[in-house]
């Protein structure tokens, strides 16, 4: 008999789905009392090397309001060649190609191990990939040179049929013609003027191709008139390499005390307009590289006077950031247009100051694009991160997909409240859409323009079954996730995942429901909800909401005597949940203190799309200890773990930090590692470096690497993350285990838990 933990892990490995509850309360009333909603973390394109795509199309339910896909939960009559849909109970005839099926000869989609299955759509043209580079030239020469080298590297990784285009901008915006032999030719636009898609189309002499007008992507065989600006790599490889080589810093002079005039908003608008009228509904990627904030035209985020700093959180709270609303509105409109056409917008921002990611965040967030933030294009952090965008799988195809749509179907006791992640609503109403919206709701279909094997959405459901209509014993609820997308090979594919979970009466089987709680998934699902609210609500209000939910969960599932905090006990399935909430409250996703608006936008962007494992690391970083006392071991994220004779390795997802304890640091300064008789010390110093490198090699975006020691200025990154169990207030306690006291007024986990227990058991609550 597998345990719930094994069941949860097997389901995640097979289907890329983790539910907050794995047994569902059978009535609306009981479900609301569970505090944490029935919800799922879904990784639609989770890598399954053991799941080859099937070279035929899915069989659909014939009822027009259902159209669910044939799956292992359907009942099949092999003699009559009929199948009953498990969502609407419609009886359907199998198509003629299934004439040979029998109980001994079943198609893959009816086998339980294929609860997730991928189909290749045979009809329709195969589309080339499209990459449009949008490059800021207002930057230092070394930065521009490094960026040009990275772009040339990326060109060498593109398939020969991929179409590429180039737009450069500074004070003016240049759209480069790529079909000209031996001559550089570009269309120049003023950067301080906003243009509609129609105006851009007319100025560039682009007429919509007939295929584009029908809403279908143009076919590869008949390139549309846009081929002056978007050309196959194989035709213009040399031309484009030469053109990039000749790119110079923006020639307009920058007076003393001024910022360069940078037209980022106009450039992005032209890029969106160009793709919109030439390749609608086709996988395309706008890759925008910026070295500073937009200082003129639509989407400007700061004036050109250097003495006026770019907005801070303090300015925004005091309503003293005059460009924020207008700029955000401009970028939101562009994000909406790009998403409607199925195009992805990436933003690679490298500068020492803020560049306007707060205002631009909707572009990558709504289109499934990447957001990368660094200090300079001339760092390994940017170069390696950018190279990882073009990672390939075993078949040498990019691990990126385009033009995804996710459709969800549910059995009649469930409705869909909404989704949170890098998606936009397709406004598809249906019988399974709930009126109570969570995140992007009011629909059962979402568009995910850019999607990779780690892209993860949080989907929230509502149990709608009435209290007085019990579900028969052994009844199961089902959900089907249907993801259609353009594979990087050009094929259209459909990934179908169908799952079922048992219903239980919460009045008689509350233990079964409690035992099915997945505290890791629930913590991340509630965290996504909190971060989503933090985008529009006041910080303290979000923390209060989070605390209230935690107290209610403790009251519902804790064991205690009224008004006796000491008696409070949580079962194993809930025991880690309060600690996740403690670290979430202190995280940069909810605390903006000490972070710029751009940094907060960057952190939240990654949190809203990563899978469960990476999200947990972001909420509660992992700490490993290395010492002479034994092999490396995970230790508590606590100040008591900081000991003089230890090396610590901390992984926060965004940073990899190596910290040498006081004694270790002194030995290193004395040079013991260079003496042959202390070779074991040299190995000890090297071990965390090797482990850190392993993480650095595989993660996207590449983390910042921090090497520090006791008393070092960078040690603050570690001290701000650990639970301050020892502070300057209690460091002289009697008989305490030695650890590093932390100078903070933050509450420790112990105080937090004591307070939580007190509130949970209070009869006044």
Swiss-Prot record:
Location relative to the cell: Cytoplasmic vesicle, COPII-coated vesicle membrane; Endoplasmic reticulum membrane; Cytoplasm, Cytosol
UniProt cross-references to Pfam families, sorted A to Z: Gelsolin, Sec23_BS, Sec23_helical, Sec23_trunk, zf-Sec23_Sec24
Gelsolin-like repeat start-end pairs: 632-718
Binding site residues for Zn(2+): 61, 66, 85, 88
Gene Ontology biological-process entries: COPII-coated vesicle cargo loading; intracellular protein transport
Gene3D superfamilies per the UniProt record, alphabetical: beta-sandwich domain of Sec23/24, Sec23/Sec24 helical domain, Severin, von Willebrand factor, type A domain, Zn-finger domain of Sec23/24
Keyword set, alphabetical order: Cytoplasm, Cytoplasmic vesicle, Endoplasmic reticulum, ER-Golgi transport, Membrane, Metal-binding, Protein transport, Transport, Zinc
Superkingdom, natural source: Eukaryota
S-S bridge residues: none
Residues spanning the signal sequence: none
Main location: membrane
GO molecular function, one term: zinc ion binding
CDD domains, A to Z: Sec23-like, Sec23_C
Membrane topology: Peripheral membrane protein
PANTHER family noted in UniProt: PROTEIN TRANSPORT PROTEIN SEC23, PROTEIN TRANSPORT PROTEIN SEC23A
Protein family membership: Belongs to the SEC23/SEC24 family. SEC23 subfamily.
Domain notes: The Gelsolin-like repeat mediates interaction with proteins containing PPP motifs.
Quaternary context: COPII is composed of at least five proteins: the Sec23/24 complex, the Sec13/31 complex and Sar1.
Identification of the protein by name: Protein transport protein Sec23A
UniProt source species: Xenopus tropicalis
Gene that encodes the chain: sec23a
């Amino acid at each position: 008999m597998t345990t719930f933990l094994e069941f949860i892990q097997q389901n995640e490995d097979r289907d890329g789905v983790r539910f907050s509850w794995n047994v569902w309360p059978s009535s609306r009333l009981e479900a609301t009392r569970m505090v944490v909603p029935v919800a799922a973390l879904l990784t639609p394109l989770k890598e399954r090397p053991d799941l080859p795509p099937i070279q035929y199309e899915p069989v659909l339910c014939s009822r027009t309001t259902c159209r669910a896909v044939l799956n292992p939960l359907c009942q099949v009559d092999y003699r009559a060649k009929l199948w009953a849909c498990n969502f609407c109970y419609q009886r359907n005839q199998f198509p003629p190609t299934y004439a040979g099926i029998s109980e001994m000869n079943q198609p893959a989609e009816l086998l339980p191990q294929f609860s997730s299955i991928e189909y290749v759509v045979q009809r329709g043209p195969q589309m080339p990939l499209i990459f449009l580079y949008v490059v800021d030239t207002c930057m230092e020469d070394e930065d521009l040179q490094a960026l040009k080298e990275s772009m040339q590297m990326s060109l060498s990784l593109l398939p020969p049929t991929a179409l590429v285009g180039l737009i450069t901008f500074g004070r003016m915006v240049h759209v480069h013609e790529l079909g000209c032999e031996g001559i550089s030719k570009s269309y120049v636009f003023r950067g301080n003027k906003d243009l509609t898609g129609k105006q851009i189309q007319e100025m560039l002499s682009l007429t919509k191709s007939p295929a584009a007008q029908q809403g279908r992507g143009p076919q590869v065989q008949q390139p549309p008139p846009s081929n002056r600006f978007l050309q196959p790599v194989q035709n213009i490889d040399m031309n484009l390499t030469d053109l990039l080589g000749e790119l110079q810093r923006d020639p307009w002079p920058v007076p003393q005390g001024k910022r360069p005039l940078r037209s980022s908003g106009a450039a992005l608008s032209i890029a969106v307009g160009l793709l919109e009228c030439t390749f609608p509904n086709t996988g395309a990627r706008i890759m925008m590289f910026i070295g500073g904030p937009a200082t003129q035209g639509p989407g400007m985020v700061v004036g050109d006077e250097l003495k006026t700093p770019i907005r801070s959180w303090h300015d925004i709270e005091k309503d003293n950031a005059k460009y924020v609303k207008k700029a955000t509105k401009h970028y939101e409109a562009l994000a909406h247009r790009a998403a409607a056409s199925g195009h992805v917008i990436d933003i690679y921002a490298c500068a020492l100051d803020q560049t306007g990611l707060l205002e631009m965040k909707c572009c990558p967030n709504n289109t499934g694009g990447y957001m990368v933030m660094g200090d300079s294009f001339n760092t390994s952090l940017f170069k390696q991160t950018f190279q990882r965008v073009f990672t390939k799988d075993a078949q040498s195809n990019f691990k990126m997909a385009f033009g995804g749509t996710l459709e969800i179907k549910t059995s009649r006791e469930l409705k869909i409240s909404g989704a949170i992640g890098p998606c936009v609503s397709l406004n598809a109403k249906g019988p399974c859409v709930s009126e109570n919206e969570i995140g992007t709701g009011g629909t059962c279909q979402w568009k995910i323009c850019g999607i990779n094997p780690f892209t993860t959405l949080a989907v929230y459901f509502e149990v709608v079954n009435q209290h007085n209509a019990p579900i028969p014993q052994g009844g199961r609820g089902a959900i089907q996730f249907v993801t259609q997308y353009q594979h990087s090979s050009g094929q259209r594919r459909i990934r179908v995942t169908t799952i079922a979970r048992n219903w239980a009466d919460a009045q008689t089987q509350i233990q079964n429901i409690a035992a099915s709680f997945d505290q890791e998934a629930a913590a991340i699902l509630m965290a996504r909800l909190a971060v989503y609210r933090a985008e529009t609500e006041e910080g303290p209000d979000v923390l209060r909401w989070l605390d209230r939910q935690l107290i209610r969960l403790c009251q519902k599932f804790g064991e205690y005597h009224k008004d006796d905090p000491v008696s409070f006990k949580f079962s194993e399935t809930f025991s880690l949940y309060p600690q996740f909430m403690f670290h979430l409250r202190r995280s940069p996703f909810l605390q903006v203190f000490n972070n710029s608006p751009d940094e907060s936008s960057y952190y939240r962007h990654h949190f809203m799309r990563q899978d469960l494992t990476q999200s947990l690391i972001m909420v509660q970083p992992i700490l490993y200890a290395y010492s002479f006392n034994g092999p490396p071991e995970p230790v508590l994220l606590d100040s008591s773990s900081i000991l003089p004779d230890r090396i610590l390795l901390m992984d926060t997802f965004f940073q990899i930090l190596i910290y040498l304890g006081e004694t270790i640091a002194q030995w290193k300064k004395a040079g013991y590692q260079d003496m042959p008789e202390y070779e074991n010390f040299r190995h000890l110093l090297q071990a965390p470096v090797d482990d850190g490198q392993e993480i650095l090699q595989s993660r996207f975006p590449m983390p910042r690497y921090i090497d520090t020691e006791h008393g070092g200025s960078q040690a603050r990154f570690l001290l701000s993350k650990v639970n301050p169990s020892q502070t300057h207030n209690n460091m002289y306690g009697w008989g305490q285990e030695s650890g590093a006291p932390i100078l903070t007024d933050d509450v420790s986990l112990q105080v937090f838990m004591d307070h939580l227990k007190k509130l949970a058991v209070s009869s006044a609550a």
